UniProtKB/Swiss-Prot annotation:
Protein name, per record: ATP-dependent dethiobiotin synthetase BioD
UniProt entry keywords in alphabetical sequence: ATP-binding, Biotin biosynthesis, Cytoplasm, Ligase, Magnesium, Metal-binding, Nucleotide-binding
HAMAP family: BioD
A single GO BP: biotin biosynthetic process
Lineage, highest ranks first: Bacteria, Pseudomonadati, Chlamydiota, Chlamydiia, Chlamydiales
Subunit description: Homodimer.
UniProt organism field: Chlamydia pneumoniae (Chlamydophila pneumoniae)
């Protein structure tokens, strides 16, 4: 049984899609500890719809799409670390964080510090935008300073030369490359999952560098 935390260099970089792919690939369950905003179409709903994975209830459901500590303040809720407990399961578990690694979680603690003591592996999601290389390097540095087990990185929308540069500079394996899809469907998720699953099952230590554009293989 593996517990894998999916974290991003920022918010909106593709963590939920990566979570859905891995949940499908590893036949894993899914848990979002804190859902901030979009309660009617939560990340748990999206992951379940795309992958069919069982999604555990969130520890906190907050109304505003803000960092957890701010959304909790607006809702007059106090986020307590003692209430953020990974669900008990014998299945693989994908855990998706809210926002970036160093986003404020409680009123006093950053998200990375809240989860760094957990017995989990980590996957970092990086999306290409102006400043993303800097954000990626800073996030990796922060994760390594906490001695986390980083399985690798998923890159989203990077040109090939920048993807290569990241690999050489950061020295993390590229687990997968997300292409710019017109629409994210169950078929797209399934296609990515099959590619990633093949590599994962061939290496008991985890995914080691699979990339590609599954949508090109649908025919």
């Amino acid at each position: 049984m593996q517990r894998i935390i999916i974290v991003g260099i920022d918010t909106g970089v593709g963590k939920t899609i990566v979570s859905a792919i891995l949940a499908r690939a590893l036949n894993a369950e899914y848990w979002k500890p804190i859902q901030a905003g979009n309660l009617e179409n939560s990340d748990s709903n999206i992951v379940h719809e795309l992958s069919g994975a069982y999604c555990h209830p969130e520890a906190y459901r907050l109304h505003k799409p803000l960092s957890p500590h701010k959304a909790a303040q607006i809702d007059n809720v106090s986020i307590e670390e003692s209430h953020i407990c990974a669900p008990k399961t014998t299945s693989n578990l994908i855990i998706e964080t809210s926002g970036g690694f160093l986003s404020p979680c409680t009123s006093k603690r950053l998200q990375g510090d809240v989860f760094s003591s957990w017995s989990c592996s980590w996957i970092l999601v990086s999306q290409a935008y102006l400043g993303s290389i800097n954000h990626t390097c800073l996030t990796v540095e922060a994760m390594r300073s906490r001695n986390l087990n980083i399985l690798g990185m998923v890159v989203n929308g990077y040109p090939e030369d920048e993807e290569h540069w990241l690999t050489q500079e950061i020295k993390l394996p590229i687990i997968g490359t997300l292409a710019k899809e017109k629409e994210i469907t169950k078929t797209i998720i399934s296609c990515y999952a099959e590619q990633w699953k093949e590599v994962w099952t061939s290496n008991h230590q985890g995914i080691q560098g699979v990339s590609g554009t599954p949508s090109l293989n649908l025919h």
